[in-house]
A protein has these predicted regions:
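Short hydrophobic/aromatic-rich beta-strand segments that constitute the beta-sheet cores
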Residues: 39, 82, 93, 106-107
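Acidic-aromatic substrate-binding/catalytic surfaces of carbohydrate-active enzymes
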Residues: 1-10, 16-88, 145
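Residue-level marker for the onset of beta-strands and adjacent loop->beta junctions
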Residues: 7, 18, 93-95, 107
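Acidic (Asp/Glu-rich), glycine- and aromatic
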Residues: 91, 98-145
Length: 145
């Protein structure tokens, strides 16, 4: 098992049913089922004014994310990796969040359409691909002033 260098302290992870808490030297990150931060506390001060969100419009309507399946992929005293897959009516999003012992975070978000996206060429039936439109997509990080 890797250990962080001095003066940093080992990381700790606590999993709940709907959230996960990752703590390291004087900082705690709380994430919910979609592995986005709901709280960042640094030196006793909350940094976020509201939870982070992935927001967008699909086919002209606001995206509603559902069927979330988060899990801790790996974790030791030096680094923790949290993952999640969630779906809307048209898209699938896979998120991986790596948090290091010094508080550095690396978030990888991949979005892809659900179902068929190209016409079937070699099948018996000619199936039309699902039509979809990703009109807008943005990431909200509401910081306190």
């Amino acid at each position: 098992m890797k250990k962080p260098i001095t003066p940093w302290t080992p990381m700790s992870v606590q999993e709940g049913e709907d959230c996960c808490s990752v703590s390291m030297w004087d900082r705690t990150y709380m994430v919910d089922k979609n592995v986005l931060f709901t709280s960042i506390v640094s030196r006793g001060n909350e940094i976020l004014s509201a939870p982070m969100r992935l927001v967008g419009l699909e086919n002209g309507e606001e995206i509603v994310w559902k069927e979330q399946s988060p899990f801790v992929m790996s974790g030791d005293e030096e680094q923790v990796t949290l993952c999640c897959s969630e779906e809307s009516s048209t898209f699938i999003v896979n998120t991986a969040l790596k948090i290091d012992f010094d508080g550095y975070c690396d978030m990888d978000i991949k979005i892809m359409p659900r179902g068929r996206t190209v016409a079937e060429e070699f099948g018996v039936d000619k199936v039309k691909p699902n039509e979809y439109s990703l009109d807008k997509l943005w990431f909200e990080i509401p910081l306190k002033k």
